[in-house]
Each structure stands twice: as C-alpha cells, then as structure tokens.
Amino acid sequence: MDIREIEQERASFAFKVVSDIKDKYSQNKKVQGKYSSYAEKAPTIILNNGLGATLAFFLSKLEKPIDDVDYKSINPESFGNAENIAYAFLYKHLSTWLAEGNGKDSAFSGLTNGEDPLKYIMEKTAIDVAISTEEALSILNWIKKFAKAMLEEEL
C-alpha cells in the first residue's frame, strides 16, 4: 500500500463528503458554516482530549438521545438545528472513514472492520487507539481543507 494511494483515498473521501454537505445544504449556509467550523476545530479537540472523548463529545451535542452508538444508524438530517446536523455529519463522516475507509477494494478500507469507532477504541489497546487517532487526524486534515474551500463560513 503506497502512502500516495492512501492520501488520494483520503482526499477522494473528504471531497465526496464535503460535496454532499454543499449539495444538500446549498440553501442552508448555517449548516455549511457550522460543519466547516467544527471540522476546523476537531483536530485540536482530539489532540487535547483524545479520539474517544471527541467522538463522545460529538454525540453529546445531538439534540435527542440515540438508541445505540452506531454510526450507520445516525441520520444527521433528523436533527433539527444547524449545530446538531453539523455535529452528526462530522461524527458520521469520521466514523465511516475509520470503519470502512473508501470501500473494500480501495487502498484504505478502514481500521475497525465496520465496527463503530467509539465502541472499537474502548475495547482496544493503546497502540490501536493511537493508530486510529493518527488516521482520524489525517482524514480531518483533508475534510478541513475541502470544507474551507467549498463551504460557506460560519455566520
């Protein structure tokens, strides 16, 4: 696996998820701005508090409780305000990358074998958590870049 391939996969995934936000919320600049702002701040939160605490923080920002910690079952569009929608999308995007990468046939197919990353890191060794944290920071670097370039700034 070539590092350039992995970087290309990260860039491709980040471009896709940010483009989806831009398309779905073309009339809602507040969601775009919140997503961009939270993506910008997420790496610092991870470095200060850890990946697990950051993922739990994102979930705590949702306006209604979720039945289970499972990124696949979270529907960001079901949350009412821009802040909740943005946090839900960021959790879902980060979790999807860590769990699945860009798919089974890609250069990077995830770290957690499809398991929700928050559950995964609570059960794994410090080395597994460190690897997951590095990957989270790497994908967020791309998400930040595309969000800053493509989305409206927070009002």
UniProtKB/Swiss-Prot annotation:
| Compartment(s) of residence | Cytoplasm
Q: Which GO terms describe its cellular component?
A: cytoplasm
Q: Which UniProt keywords apply?
A: Antiviral defense, Cytoplasm
Pfam families, alphabetized: Cas_Cmr5
Query: Which Gene3D superfamilies has this protein been placed in?
Result: AF1862-like domain
| Gene Ontology biological process terms, A to Z | defense response to virus
The function of this protein is: CRISPR (clustered regularly interspaced short palindromic repeat), is an adaptive immune system that provides protection against mobile genetic elements (viruses, transposable elements and conjugative plasmids). CRISPR clusters contain sequences complementary to antecedent mobile elements and target invading nucleic acids. CRISPR clusters are transcribed and processed into CRISPR RNA (crRNA). Part of the Cmr ribonucleoprotein complex.
The record's annotation in NCBIfam families points to: cas_Cmr5
The protein's name: CRISPR system Cmr subunit Cmr5
Q: Which organism is it from?
A: Archaeoglobus fulgidus (strain ATCC 49558 / DSM 4304 / JCM 9628 / NBRC 100126 / VC-16)
Q: What is the lineage of its organism?
A: Archaea, Methanobacteriati, Methanobacteriota, Archaeoglobi, Archaeoglobales
